[in-house]
Curated annotation (Swiss-Prot):
Protein species of origin: Streptomyces griseus
Knockout-associated phenotype: Deletion of the gene leads to accumulation of beta-carotene.
Gene name as annotated: crtU
Cofactor(s) needed: FAD
Name this polypeptide is given: Carotenoid phi-ring synthase
Domain of life from the UniProt record: Bacteria
Length: 517
């Protein structure tokens, strides 16, 4: 029924230089009396931790404050004006081929990843008229970089001559945590200025990438941008094309994983926020919800930055003074908007399923959901309409939200002029501000997987892992690492993990990168 996990892990990618992270050794699983562990947070990180612990025979309780699992990729039903019940979510997410550990989690319930659909291109448009694409760019570095430069309209011969090679070659050998030691002190924008990237390439390709962190590139750490270059472009041969779930997140991902957890005897408690943690003098921890206090042997904190700050503040005995102070300084990225629009007519047949944009006011990307999501496609076929989604990241906290929504729609009309004549049958607007912020100089404040208390581990996409991972893959990887740390204490085998190469891909590239030092 389910894929069986051996703990050894499989890369399942094309990159022969992908790096293995060995699992802690030990016996196969608990037999007899096993420890009780609470995992707090039912997003990707929490599900990964709960999955591995349960597979090893640990007694796991998973706490999630929302009605369903998935965290920031959750979904919920909503009824349209035509009476149709559809699934709303926080929008498009790209499942890149480099996400080895996230894909390994999904393979527990979908061994062939048939729930994911490949998108054929990753196009980028700028309001000035410039357009770029990654469909024809070679996947293997350094051919990928050379191909992008050769094919992109944003790079000319004059631009190449202006580039500062001493600053640029450091991107050829990105290592964690060294990249943070070198670049965490400057912004992504200042770093690109130092390299003297062409202005057009700066705004089109690299600003689009940096805003995927839900942050203004003027505030984003250059180390995160350099790591992103390495993961998606210069360090991996998996390429920049990606997959998307073929159905809404709950049906494609979380409902099967919820069932998998229950089969492995995980007590999944949704609609149950955790209020306080109190370490016990003799070992273990007391966890308090709205209606009870329960003792556990260990704890995985798999919360977003804001929820982690609040829980630690409400738990004065948790951790030590330095750890608590660093947690208190964690920042949350600015608000972002997801607008989903149900239109009375289709967009042009040649519009891509996903489009990254720059220079269109607040609009950062456009998705035509009925190109790839089954539920949206069925609605579009029945109504002869279309389902379009707009994202606007890093919105000023004091912005007029209605005005931002209206302006994003106006920019859609610029991007896809045929939508001007479309009638808006229904719309949903989701405003959220719960993604982690990776500000200049902020790396030292981010928690690691291990806390001062060996019975408490931390997971999430803001966690320092010492590995070249980001976004959803950082969440999944940190969840497995958090479980590994606990299993290692108990002498039980952990999960083997994979990452993109952990340094430059060849000795030549590494020697070139050394010139930047």
């Amino acid at each position: 029924m389910f894929a069986r996990d051996s703990g050894r892990g499989h890369r399942h990618g094309r990159d022969r230089q992908a790096a293995v992270v060995p699992a802690p050794a030990g016996r196969a699983r608990f037999t007899g009396d096993a420890p009780a562990v609470a995992v707090v947070g039912g997003g990707i990180a929490g599900i990964a931790a709960a999955t591995l612990l349960a597979e090893r025979g640990v007694r796991v309780t998973l706490y999630e404050r929302e009605p369903g699992l998935g965290g920031r990729l959750s979904g919920w039903p909503t009824e349209l004006t035509d009476g149709t019940t559809v699934t709303m979510s926080r929008g498009f997410h790209a499942f890149f081929r480099q996400y080895y550990n996230l894909r390994g989690l999904l393979r527990r319930v979908d061994p062939d990843l048939g729930s994911l659909t490949r998108l054929p291109d990753y196009p980028l448009w700028h309001g000035s008229g410039l357009r770029d694409s990654f469909a024809r760019v070679p996947r293997t570095p350094p051919l990928s970089a050379m191909g992008f430069v050769a094919l992109s309209p944003t790079f000319g011969l004059r631009d190449l001559v202006r580039i500062n090679p001493r600053a640029a070659v450091g991107l050829l050998d990105v290592r964690v945590p060294e990249v943070y030691e070198r670049l965490d002190g400057i912004s992504a924008t200042d770093f690109l200025d130092r390299i003297r990237f062409p202005e057009a390439a700066h705004h089109l390709a690299f600003e689009v990438f940096s805003r995927s962190f839900f942050a203004d590139p003027r505030e984003l750490s250059a180390a995160e941008l350099a790591l992103m270059f390495h993961i998606y472009f210069l360090g991996s041969s998996e390429g920049l094309l990606f997959d998307v779930p073929g159905e809404p997140f709950p049906a494609a991902l979380w409902e099967p994983l919820h069932h998998y957890l229950e089969v492995h005897r995980v007590d999944v408690r949704t609609r149950t926020p955790l209020r306080q943690v109190r370490p016990r003098p003799g070992g273990g921890l007391d966890l308090t919800t709205d209606d009870r206090t329960t003792r556990y042997d260990a704890l995985v904190l798999a919360l977003d930055s804001g929820a982690l700050r609040r829980l630690v503040a409400a738990s004065p005995e948790l951790g030590d003074t330095d750890w608590r102070a660093r947690i208190a300084r964690l920042r949350t990225a600015p608000p972002f908007l997801v607008s989903r629009l149900w239109l009375d007519r289709p967009v042009a047949h040649d519009r891509p399923g996903f489009l990254g944009t720059s220079g269109y006011g607040p609009l950062d990307n456009v998705s035509v959901l009925d190109r790839w999501e089954g539920e949206a496609a069925r609605w579009a076929r029945r109504t002869r309409g279309s389902v379009v989604e707009l994202h606007a990241y890093a919105v000023a906290p004091d912005a007029d939200r209605s005005a931002v929504q209206d302006e994003a729609l106006r920019q859609l009309h610029r991007v896809y002029p045929e939508t001007r004549s479309a009638r808006l049958l229904d719309a949903r607007h989701e405003w959220r501000a719960d993604c982690p912020m990776f500000p200049v100089g902020g790396y030292r404040d981010r928690p690691g997987v291990r806390s001062p208390d060996p019975a408490v581990t931390v997971a999430g996409d803001m966690v320092r892992t010492e590995l070249p991972v980001a976004l959803m893959e950082r969440a999944a990887t940190s969840g497995f690492l958090a479980a590994n740390a606990l299993l290692e204490r108990w002498g039980v085998r952990g999960q083997t993990l994979w990452t993109v190469p952990r340094a430059g891909r060849s000795a030549v590239l590494r020697r070139l990168a050394a010139l930047a030092d």
